[in-house]
Structures are given as C-alpha cells and as structure tokens.
Amino acid sequence: EQPQLITVNNYDENGFRETLLKITTHTGTHIDPPAHIYNGKATLDSLPPEQFIGKALVIDCRSIKPGGHITLQHITAYGAKAKAADFLLFNLGWDKYWGTETYLGQYPCLNDEAINFILEGSYKGIGFDVMGIDPIDDENLTLHKKLFKNKQIVNIENLKNLDLCGSGLFLFSCFPLKIAN
C-alpha cells in the first residue's frame, strides 16, 4: 500500500502547513521487532534506545546469485570485525531493483549456518537491502520465527546505499518512531 499524504492545515486557512502521513509499519526502510511475529514479545516502543545504536559492519554479498544463500563464510570473512559489530548489514546489491518486479523476486537469504551464527552472537540487529529475511515464497516466515523466537534482536529491511558505508566498523543508528505497539 502506498503512503498517503493528506493536508490537515494550510497557510491560507491556518497560517501554517501540516500534513497527515498514513503508512503501514512496513513502508520503505523499516524495522521488525520480535512482536512482528510473536504476540507478547518486544515491540519497537518497548525496546531501550541502546537497542538501536552501535557499531555496524556491512557484509558484501553482491556476488550471490538470485535465490542463493548468505553463508557463514560471507560473515566470517570479516574476521574480528564481524564479532565486534552490534549490527550486521547485508549488502546484496538488491536496492537497485527497488520499484521493479525483480525486487519482489528471488533475493538471496541467510542459510541455517549463518542465522545460527547470528543467534549465537550478541548482535542487536541485522539488516538487508531486500524486503525480508525469508524467501519470497516462504509464507511460514521460517527465518523470522527462528530469529525472534528466543532473542531480543531487530531486523531492518529495505536498506539502501549500503555500498557507501565502507568496509570497516562504523557508528550506526536506526531509531524508530516511538509509537505504542
């Protein structure tokens, strides 16, 4: 669903301009908390601010073919930097397909070894330049369920321009709007 912009006040009638923005919680770049999948788990507004800031590392996965997998080797190739990061951001190069049918297609996803490594670590979040962590045809949301079942972690989707972040650790923040539930 496309965002809607509705003028609620204007200069001529009210002396100022104000716009109502109507969007779903999955519009553009967004964050999934555990409550996205599990009732009673942490919502974005219940997580502490420090959940949304820390050291990030971009994992270059642009060589993976459509329908392929992000493997443990993609992560461990970064050595100590991968373990020192609070956020692992996966650059699949998929943001270039935004607005096309390809974007909604067979984007690469984490394999079991890679997600297990993430779950065994102390990461605050993971992020991707694709629309989800599950394959497009996985209606069961298997990876979402595995990620959020026993871990307080966030999943950031539809990131853009990860290639501009460099190859080292950098300060990253992804503070959401503080809206209840």
Over which residues does each language-model region extend?
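Active-/binding-site microenvironments in catalytic and ligand-binding cores
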Residues: 1-181
